Amino acid sequence: MNQRLFIQKKSEFDVISQKTTIELQNLVPHAVCKVFVIYDLFGIDENQLAKVQNTIFVDPVTDILYTHYEDAIVENFPYSKNFFATEFLPGQYNQRDDSAEQCLLLMNVEGVTVKSGMLYVFNGELTNEELLKLKEYLINPIESREKDLSIMEIPSYPTATEVPVIEGFVEADESKLKKIYADFGLSLEMDDLKFIQEYFQSIKRNPTETELKVLDTYWSDHCRHTTFETEITDVDFQSKFNTTLQKTFEYYQKIRQELGTTKPIRLMDLATVMGKYLSRTGVVKNIDVSEEINACSIVVPIDIDGEEEEWLLQFKNETHNHPTEVEPYGGASTCVGGAIRDPLSGRSYVFQAMRISGAANPLEKIDNTLPGKLPQRKISKEAANGYSSYGNQIGLATTFVKEIYDEGYKAKRMEVGFVAGAVKKEYVRREEPVAGDKIILLGGATGRDGVGGASGSSKTHDGLDLDDLSAEVQKGNAIVERKIQRLFRNPEVLKLIKKCNDFGAGGVSVAIGEIARGIYIDLDKVPLKYAGLNGTELAISESQERMAVAVEAKDVDTFIALAKEENLDATCVADVTDDETMTLVWRGKKIVEIDRKFLDTNGVRKQAKVIVTDEEYPNPFEQKEFNKEQFIQMMQELNHASQKGMVEMFDNNV
């Protein structure tokens, strides 16, 4: 049978209703709200329900159980018709569902599916317009939707269709290419699409949909830093500091000459040239250099019980501005989760984090929210909840938390996570995979949530509805990443790994595609969260908490067995080949076959001219007169307000 439960906290314990009411009264001052958790249990019999009802779902001391929402409404607001229910969109990870199903298995109740939601019941003095306001505030269409309480069914997923070939692509004129560009919603530029057309003309075939999407992802700004790799053809200084700037630029060019650098001037070169110079000249001797694309790494001496050992200290920062802007909780949680993945893929144990964020005024009236955006208050509060929840669950000491307030962040929020990790150097084996080696996918399963995350964060967003971005942000699963952290504490495991890459932006096509020059990936072996994903979605979904691990063929079974000891799924999904081609196979057909040399071009290099001018910013060194009025004005600024409440959400002493 199927059963629906409505769980409400007793008034003495109903903190969630109190908090929700206070929050919503910023929008509708006379609103009063009661919150219920909904559990839909599919395939459970009466005996099983009796066994688990008061163990997993209801605490008789603190909770009240209803089986019909009408009863819940009558008990709280008799005659009120102001209520609605919400649920996550199909395909979004729901930790409450996952935890409930695991608890059922622990009690030997198998075959039961759990789908949860929330019921919000309001006092009867609300107008339809006010109820609609509350509904729009509580439901973010990128992650959730209104739940129909008259229906109780498991969401169905469409059957995966074959990957189509883009007919007529190689013959397309510019107008046809522009239509293809618009139809596929590409983040690439038109000159990149023409470059792709030239490649497929040279091999005399049309690309598949997957090949075009993979290139759009692989060459995205998020994955390949195309903005920082843009060639700077001319620099013009128009500043009051011209002399100083010109001397600095000439010094930079001199350093390039000493290093023998012939590549074009780029922002990436400006950022890295001094590190290369100091390393080359022997000033800096502890930089750990490798072919892996993971975190920054330095070699440090560590005193272990009086013995000095060489360890790798690794650190990484990650921005999740776009994801947090559109889905604050998931965007901020996967900010720290994504930052952790980089040093973790470098085999480090991540032990420390910092968070710096930027927002406009969170006290702004919700009615003043810009069209197509979430209220600043909602973004700030839910982002703090998301980041702290993920870090606290994984067991990470977040030792610095700061939010900066400026109206400029209304255009785009800033969400920055920083982490540090360490590993004993002798445990890290770094070798280039060779033909015959195997690639193991370690960790979470793949879902539709995360398709387009890399290309989405690389686009210019003009007038998009939040609904259009629903697949680009995921909910993280900190518990799975914590298991990977534990697994990688085992020296036996680390010594099996020749090379490792985390599943960040781009999913399988990037994480496994980068690990060796020749790779053959069987997408049918990729574990799924649910049925219905097609080959394109399998190739580019960046579902969280996964690693691509290269091992020798003889070590596959050993690695998988060690992963199972940590309750981690590990599946061999790819082979390293010697043909310098990235090949992806789905349902026995090649849906991607791209030459490595073409893939490595990263598209058409962009060019730009730079004009350096002065901006009208307040002079930070200006000495203002100290008086009562200026002191009061300064203390009234948001950036001088106490952030203690936010800081205390983060565990800083794990």
What do these predicted regions represent?
Residues 1-11, 35-40, 78-90, 119-120, ...:
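Short glycine-/aliphatic-rich beta-strand segments at the starts of folded cytosolic domains
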Residues 11-28, 53, 92-108, 513-526:
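Short amphipathic alpha-helix segments
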Residues 19-24, 49-59, 97-104, 130-139, ...:
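Short amphipathic alpha-helices in soluble, non-transmembrane regions
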Residues 19-74:
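Acidic (E/D-rich), amphipathic helical modules within compact regulatory domains
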Residues 27-37, 52-53, 80-81, 85, ...:
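Interaction-mediating elements
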Residues 30-34, 67-81, 111-116, 167-171, ...:
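Flexible hinge/switch segments at interdomain interfaces of large molecular machines
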Residues 59-111, 256:
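Short, solvent-exposed interaction modules
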Residues 91-93, 111, 117-130, 135-654:
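Glycine/proline-enriched, intrinsically flexible loops and inter-domain linkers
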